[in-house]
Curated annotation (Swiss-Prot):
Oligomeric form and interacting partners: Monomer.
Classification of source organism: Bacteria, Pseudomonadati, Pseudomonadota, Gammaproteobacteria, Pseudomonadales
Organism: Pseudomonas paraeruginosa (strain DSM 24068 / PA7) (Pseudomonas aeruginosa (strain PA7))
GO biological process, one term: rRNA processing
Reactions listed under catalytic activity: cytidine(2498) in 23S rRNA + S-adenosyl-L-methionine = 2'-O-methylcytidine(2498) in 23S rRNA + S-adenosyl-L-homocysteine + H(+)
InterPro entries associated with the record: RlmM_FDX, RlmM_THUMP-like, RNA_MeTrfase_FtsJ_dom, rRNA_MeTrfase_M, SAM-dependent_MTases_sf
Keyword Manganese: no
Annotated protein name in UniProt: Ribosomal RNA large subunit methyltransferase M
Cell compartments where the protein resides: Cytoplasm
Superkingdom field: Bacteria
Residues involved in S-adenosyl-L-methionine binding: S184, A217, P218, G219, G220, D236, D256, D272
Protein's gene: rlmM
Function: Catalyzes the 2'-O-methylation at nucleotide C2498 in 23S rRNA.
Family: Belongs to the class I-like SAM-binding methyltransferase superfamily. RNA methyltransferase RlmE family. RlmM subfamily.
Listed Gene3D superfamilies: 3.30.2300.20, 3.30.70.2810, Vaccinia Virus protein VP39
Amino acid sequence: MNTLLMHCRPGFEGEVCAEIAEHAATLEIPGYARSKPASAHVEFVCQDVDGAERLMRRLRFAELIFPRQWARGPGFIELPESQRIEVLLEELASYPVCGSLWLEVLDTNAGKEVSTFCRKFEKPLRAALVKAGRLQEDLALPRLLLTFRSGREVFVGLAEPRNSALWPMGIPRLKFPREAPSRSTLKLEEAWHQFIPRQEWDKRLAPDMLAVDLGAAPGGWTWQLVNREMRVTAVDNGPMAENLMYSGLVDHQKVDGYQYRPRQRVDWMVCDIVEKPARTGALIETWIGEGLCREAVVNLKLPMKQRYAEVRKILQRLRESFDARGLKVAFGCKQLYHDREEVTCHLRRLER
């Protein structure tokens, strides 16, 4: 199992290659990354047979920025038109017993077509794996991840459930709320799922908390905050959705989001303003560094080139700034499924 397969947003294969190559070099695990443009996946081929397993053991998936999902295996294998299950059982003879099964596809138009096949194929495959003793429900065991590039080509991979994506392919199944004024609302909801353990939501996303939404109009992110019954200052020169204003929980301030400062410390600051990432990074530095908020979710809009390098530079500058202030800050940064040419950062100021 010398190959690490990583899913990603189409068009960001280069960022995944740069990110995993940097980590592998730091960990002294030799190998090379390969991908095709807009293929929505990257393979990192290790020189050592156990290289992919060592990478997954040494890295925390949650700390990777651009990969949506990962799995280790020997590479893609071909399947016949018939007797696919028999071929897979033969391939899995050398694998450990697995505790769960996910059938995955790539986030491409071809992948969407393959998903129909996967839905039909999963039930008989699961039954065959259980009967053969290759699958039993136990989250302490590795997860079997089958990534189908077509009905005839599959990557037979493994990953630890607690060190891989929260959802198949890293894609959450979130329902767009009809009352929300824009689809951007799903970005903030996904960020909460990604960065905040579900059992902590009632404490960290509690009613009557104070929140500021910078660049709020028309109110997609504000809707999520109001839905949690927070008191929100919506900062934007543009108009807010009327249903949000009728809630009685929103104070609309028509000022520049980058100039606004709250009169008192707030629990949450969220920001989805289209601006150069360096300027947004400086905004994060001010709000967290000066104690204007306890937690923040902020989107960094990325340039067309050197996107991974730009994100790394901003995160490094933030860490250095907070260290110089003597602050303890928890970081998270991920390109979420609902993100486009951007990444989402979560920061939480901790008490020393």
